């Protein structure tokens, strides 16, 4: 086919087709049918324009090539065949000088006589199907469409064929000749079948036999065959259709399409009530680490050994006491539980050899904290089905909570940089293809921006805790196992570091189903005084357990060290997802990649390097009451990562519902900003669906508050 194209078409046309394919990254050695189609289309555009001029009186005249009057103004401006940038420049220039409406897609020609853009189509299928596809794609009454086929058929907007009979006959004859030449070389069948629909994703597979019969039988009423239905769908114009259908429905259905204007949306109503409280499985910005650098002790890497080594680095332990009680809990039991952990760790140190794992004694305080024997007894349904007043016990509605400032502070802190490196660059083999090289470059730049981020620390902490808890839940089902909360990182100088955040004690864990719950008690170190924001720590009992000497500008200062203790629970499926938290890195990298791709397609080259190395440029990060916040590309990477991490840490049905429902409103607002004149019905119902997800979850309430800021600034 390639040889045929080079013989059959003018070298200038072949060169333009080669350029066009290169611009779109297509290989003409492989896509030979496409190469032929582009050449054919170019030739038809040139033939359409040839010999047509406008004289001094503004009349259209036909002049042969050797005529001395060839200096007359060309009737048609050829846009097809130019590179994209030049083509758009020509289109913009025409629009500015003639007042024509700017088309959404690049047309092929401009007709100075009729003052309209023209889209030329050359099809190997039926002209009406291709015409409908073109019209459906362009969606503009201003652009004139003219379709030619290889069989001599043609179709044009409003049957206005623009050119005289003879000029069109020349084009049809040339197309018929190309078809004959291809057929004589055995190339026509392949060429005919290779035509794709206009900008559609699906291939037009030939459906035969049983599948074809089933397709024809499965159509809506009034359609005799699949092709008719396809043509109808391709040419379907949705405006006014929904209203028409609604009017045919039951009289009880009275949905009216209301125009959605800048004044239409109202802010989302956030609930009133006491401030929301912390509900993550482990402490975030308030966590304190006991650390060892360059660990080389015996048993290094065994969690219990590492934990004991970290505990030995602190010398300020003191008699613990409760500073912030848990309102509903038996606080002395939390205090006794911590004392028990200290005592049993001391027992281990006195032993000759430290064991790999530690099962706690089943004391009354731990049994209470872990809910041992608290579950209601299960009775077989057959034994009680005759009881007349058998019913499920009533459960209280959750109490509404209001947004509190601590969750925004948590998020801001998650976006910040720490002085440690939490992820290493993956060791991946040499790049083979150019695309791999670009992917590696993007990954390396992104990793450099987020490796020090606190959100990345949360990922590694979450992965470790969930992995350890799931392992213990399966390996020691009946035991109250002590699980150290550990993470590993590197200092800026590259030295390895092991960190201890506290401990978890796991309850009984016979987890048969994914949703079966294992209870655990978490005990976490902190320097945060809980009395500063008591509402945040509603679910915790907080002890003061020691004094820590900290270096400051005025020398060493002593600060009280606290232990945040609470009963919590999780399930197999939650732990499984917790172990997968590294996916957050991938999700945010993909979001950054789509930003790079958008920039690259505008500049027509890969912009990865410029994107990350142009430190002066700022990018939108998010909305706040002050307006659109902007920051460096590193800040954008870390903010996107923090959002993804918080979606994982604060995953809940409230978040699922809010994300799904608010997205609908977001799409309508974006359509309004794009001047697409959106319409809605039952907007009140959508607000209701969004607001019923705003109950007490801090992350959902913060997202709703951000959404309101977006609404305010988007509709100015």
UniProtKB/Swiss-Prot annotation:
* BP term (GO), one: cap snatching
Annotated EC: 3.1.-.-
GO MF assignments:
endonuclease activity; metal ion binding; RNA binding
Locate the residues binding Mn(2+) 2.
80, 108
Q: Where is this motif: Nuclear localization signal 2 (NLS2)?
A: 184-247
The prosthetic group or cofactor this protein requires is: Mn(2+)
Q: Which keywords has UniProt assigned to this entry?
A: Cap snatching, Endonuclease, Eukaryotic host gene expression shutoff by virus, Eukaryotic host transcription shutoff by virus, Host cytoplasm, Host gene expression shutoff by virus, Host nucleus, Host-virus interaction, Hydrolase, Inhibition of host RNA polymerase II by virus, Manganese, Metal-binding, Nuclease, Phosphoprotein
Which Pfam families does this chain map to? Flu_PA (PF00603)
The residues the record assigns to binding Mn(2+) 1 are 41, 108, 119-120
Q: Which domain of life is it from?
A: Viruses
- Read off the InterPro entries from this record: INFV_PA, PA/PA-X, PA/PA-X_sf
EC primary class: hydrolase
Motif Nuclear localization signal 1 (NLS1) covers: 124-139
Task: Tell me how the protein is altered or processed after translation.
Answer: Phosphorylated on serines and threonines by host kinases, including human casein kinase II.
- State the GO CC annotations: host cell cytoplasm; host cell nucleus
- Recite the UniProt cofactor note for this protein: Binds 2 manganese ions per subunit.
Which coarse location class describes where this protein primarily resides?
A: host cell
Subcellular location(s): the record lists: Host cytoplasm; Host nucleus
What job does the chain carry out? Plays an essential role in viral RNA transcription and replication by forming the heterotrimeric polymerase complex together with PB1 and PB2 subunits. The complex transcribes viral mRNAs by using a unique mechanism called cap-snatching. It consists in the hijacking and cleavage of host capped pre-mRNAs. These short capped RNAs are then used as primers for viral mRNAs. The PB2 subunit is responsible for the binding of the 5' cap of cellular pre-mRNAs which are subsequently cleaved after 10-13 nucleotides by the PA subunit that carries the endonuclease activity.
Subunit structure, per the record? Influenza RNA polymerase is composed of three subunits: PB1, PB2 and PA. Interacts (via C-terminus) with PB1 (via N-terminus).
Q: Which HAMAP family did the record assign?
A: INFV_PA (MF_04063)
User: What's the family?
Assistant: Belongs to the influenza viruses PA family.
Q: What is this protein called?
A: Polymerase acidic protein
Q: What organism is recorded for this protein? A: Influenza A virus (strain A/USA:Albany/12/1951 H1N1)
